[in-house]
Amino acid sequence: MSRNELDERIETYYVRVRGVVQGVGFRHATVREAHALKLRGWVANLEDGSVEAMIQGPGAQIDRMLAWLRHGPPAARVTEVTFEERLIERRFDRFQQQ
C-alpha cells in the first residue's frame, strides 16, 4: 500500500450519542460539522432520545468529529458517546440528516 493510499484510507464508524441531544439542534449542527470536515454518512434521532450516526472519511477527520460529538452544539448536554468501526463496502455520497 502506498503512502497516498494510507492517507486516503476511508473508515466508517457507527456512533451513538446520549444525553440531552434531541430538540437542541444536534442533528443540524452535526451535519454542518461533518460538511466542514468533508465527512460523509448520516445522523438520525432514535426513539430512546439518543442520536445515532454513521460517519465515513479519513481517520483523522473522524477523530475530529468524534471529539466534537463529545460536546455537540451549545444547547446539548452530552453524557455518553459510544462508537465502533464498521467494515462496510458502501460509500456514502454526502452527509445528511435522516
Swiss-Prot record:
Keywords: Hydrolase. The active site is at R27, N45. InterPro entries: Acylphosphatase, Acylphosphatase-like_dom, Acylphosphatase-like_dom_sf, Acylphosphatase_CS. It is an enzyme of class 3 (hydrolase). Residues 12-98 form the Acylphosphatase-like domain. The keyword Acetylation does not apply. One of its GO terms (molecular function) is acylphosphatase activity. Signal peptide: none annotated. Belongs to the acylphosphatase family. This is Acylphosphatase. The lineage of its organism: Bacteria, Pseudomonadati, Pseudomonadota, Betaproteobacteria, Burkholderiales.
